[in-house]
């Protein structure tokens, strides 16, 4: 809650360029209220209390929190008001407390109970389930005494709907289908919800025991390559950012080594611009019981995970110098949430250069408007969707196999068949047959680092009897 935040103009209800979201407003509100509430609790300086209360009143005076168009906005706004209400309860005016409790009821709880809205976040197996449920649970726990029936309903629905989502997103090994950027987002809200449940009710009802969930911070540890770049498959940007949820896992499992990359980023000043900085003060609570003085590098060079989007990542020595080489390879399918036609693609870092790369996501707002003007829908994941006309999203842009310049099959799954982990070779083989089955009889790809210095890519493709196979791929 710095001088820029303290002097920021009043929060106003404003849809973004897509006329669909107020998500930026919700996130700005969360940044202001959460950080100022934290600053007040740490310093006792009334200016932070005043600013947080002003911003709480502003958003509680909105006509709604945009539940009709984009319920994700509600999840983040409910989180903002919940933390302000809970952390500042004794110091807030009675009028503000009443207004906040009423807003949570009217704009969040009742909207989550209204069948007129698209409430598919309850059935979703992606970050929406985590963010919307996480925000609603925090709000329900904070204001339970005011609206016990609705709050109880929010908590019970979250416990019921979140468990199957976790099983899809993290089982069996912890790798996250939507990639690094959405791990930082969705998993952060997930641990926020778990921490709130445990601190208030003494249990998370077994959610944290979901197979693979305890391993997911290690997956994220291996997702960072050289030069501060993620293995950025799916709708994710290449620049690495703070994985704030890793602090919860380090505390939960008494394993500070999970913070090897986080401490490096923190010391380099990279946390100052982290994507999820609106919840940055959380790490202070999670770090309270950790010894951060001597954290060693991971002992294993390779990490592999199966599940919806199987991946294999390699760091040859974890020094982030010229002796360290980094490789990330993925399988899965384009039809997954935020998926690209990138099954079989890989990134490779060596000697300060990302030799094989992924462009990553493109602005949703611009793509939505452009495709809509052409009669398309960015979020239509069907085989013939205009989504796949976008160069960044189709296979012709990725370092995977393309045959006869045809699109990958959106529901074809590339499976991890072999993990290569020997003294001289590190990598994996994926079977891409389903992905290209309309163009080839079979296809496999092997990518490996040999002797910690050479990259080998080997594709084995068997043509169909009824057509030739013109093969291409780019890096």
Model-derived segments and their meaning:
Residues 1-5:
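Hydrophobic alpha-helical membrane-insertion signals
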Residues 6-14, 18-226, 236-237:
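Aromatic-lined, polymer-binding surfaces characteristic
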Residues 178, 182-475:
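Extended polysaccharide-engagement surfaces of secreted carbohydrate-active enzymes
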């Amino acid at each position: 809650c710095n001088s820029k935040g303290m002097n920021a103009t009043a929060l106003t209800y404003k849809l973004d360029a897509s006329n669909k979201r107020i998500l930026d407003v919700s996130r700005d509100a969360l940044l202001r209220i959460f950080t100022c509430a934290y600053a007040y609790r740490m310093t006792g300086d009334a200016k932070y209390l005043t600013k947080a209360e002003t911003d709480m009143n502003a958003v509680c005076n909105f006509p709604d929190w945009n539940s009709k168009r984009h319920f994700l906005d509600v999840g983040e706004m409910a989180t903002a008001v919940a933390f302000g209400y809970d952390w500042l309860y004794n110091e807030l005016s009675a009028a503000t407390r009443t207004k906040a409790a009423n807003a949570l009821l009217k704009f969040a709880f009742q909207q989550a109970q209204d069948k007129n809205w698209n409430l598919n976040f309850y059935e979703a197996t992606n970050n929406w389930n985590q963010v919307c449920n996480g925000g609603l649970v925090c709000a329900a726990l904070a204001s339970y005494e005011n609206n016990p029936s609705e709050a109880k309903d929010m908590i019970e629905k979250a416990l019921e709907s979140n468990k199957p989502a976790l099983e899809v997103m993290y089982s069996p090994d912890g790798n996250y289908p939507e990639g690094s950027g959405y791990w930082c987002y969705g998993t952060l809200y997930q641990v926020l919800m778990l921490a709130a449940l445990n601190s208030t009710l003494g249990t998370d009802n077994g959610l944290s025991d979901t197979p693979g969930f305890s391993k997911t911070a290690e997956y994220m540890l291996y997702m960072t390559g050289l030069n501060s770049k993620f293995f950025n498959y799916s709708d994710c940007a290449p620049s690495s950012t703070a994985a704030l949820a890793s602090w919860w896992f380090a505390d939960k499992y008494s394993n500070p080594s999970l913070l090897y990359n986080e401490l490096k980023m923190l010391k380099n000043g990279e946390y100052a611009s982290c994507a999820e900085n609106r919840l940055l003060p959380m790490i202070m609570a999670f770090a309270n019981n950790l010894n951060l003085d001597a954290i060693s590098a991971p002992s294993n060079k390779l990490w592999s995970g199966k599940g919806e989007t199987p991946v294999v990542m390699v760091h040859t020595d974890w020094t982030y110098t010229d002796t360290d080489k980094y490789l990330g390879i993925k399988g899965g399918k384009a039809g997954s949430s935020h998926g690209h036609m990138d099954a079989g693609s890989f990134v490779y870092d060596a000697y300060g250069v990302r030799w094989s790369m992924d462009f990553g996501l493109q602005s949703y707002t611009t793509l939505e408007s452009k495709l809509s003007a052409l009669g398309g829908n960015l979020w239509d994941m069907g085989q013939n969707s205009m989504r796949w006309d976008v160069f960044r999203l189709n296979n012709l842009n990725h370092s995977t196999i393309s045959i006869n310049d045809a699109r990958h099959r959106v529901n074809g799954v590339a499976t991890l068949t072999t993990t290569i982990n020997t003294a001289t070779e590190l990598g994996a083989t994926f079977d891409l047959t389903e992905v290209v089955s309309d163009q080839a009889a079979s296809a496999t790809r092997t990518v490996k680092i040999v002797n910690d210095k050479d990259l080998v890519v080997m594709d084995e493709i068997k043509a169909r009897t009824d057509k030739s196979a013109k093969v291409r791929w780019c890096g």
